[in-house]
């Protein structure tokens, strides 16, 4: 149990339902994990800007979640996951609430992050979105795991 906080530093989370704080703007939502681990203000500013740039989120850093589209909210959620520079990102149905174009773009972003050295573990019901991408797919069917 004492290792949980250090493990959390190495894991980023992306959820289907975003889990953004409605009373905080985009910048502060992404900065939250850095505050939790005790980063100073200058490092937070730099890393948040870098994470938002990485996910292609420009111009709405002072907007609040209710002002964003579903695709924009998911990009903010992904920026919050990568801002700590984790070794692993757990993505639980990250495309579930997105239109097909936004879902495709999000999977491309996850692939880019993976190509930069971060392991991505993504749960998805949308097999057509992930098949043929040259990635390992493990299917859970009837309680059994099947690899491809």
Language-model segments: which ranges?
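Conserved ABC ATPase signature
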Residues: 64-68, 72
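ABC ATPase NBD coupling module
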Residues: 1-12, 41, 113-115
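Conserved catalytic motifs of ABC-family nucleotide-binding domains
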Residues: 85
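Catalytic Walker B motif of ABC-type/P-loop ATPase nucleotide-binding domains
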Residues: 89-92
């Amino acid at each position: 149990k004492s290792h949980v906080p250090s493990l959390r530093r190495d894991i980023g989370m992306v959820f289907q339902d975003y889990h953004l704080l409605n009373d905080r703007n985009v910048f502060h939502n992404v900065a939250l994990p850095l505050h939790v681990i005790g980063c100073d203000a200058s490092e937070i500013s730099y890393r948040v800007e870098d994470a938002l740039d990485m996910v292609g989120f420009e111009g709405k850093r002072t907007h609040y979640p209710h002002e964003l589209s579903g695709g924009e909210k998911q990009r903010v959620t992904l920026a919050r996951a990568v801002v700590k520079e984790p070794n692993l990102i757990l993505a639980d149905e990250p495309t579930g609430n997105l239109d097909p174009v936004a879902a495709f773009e999000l999977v491309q972003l996850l692939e880019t992050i993976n190509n930069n050295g971060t392991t991505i573990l993504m749960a998805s019901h949308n097999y057509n979105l992930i098949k043929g991408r040259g990635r390992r797919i493990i299917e859970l069917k009837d309680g059994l795991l099947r690899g491809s």
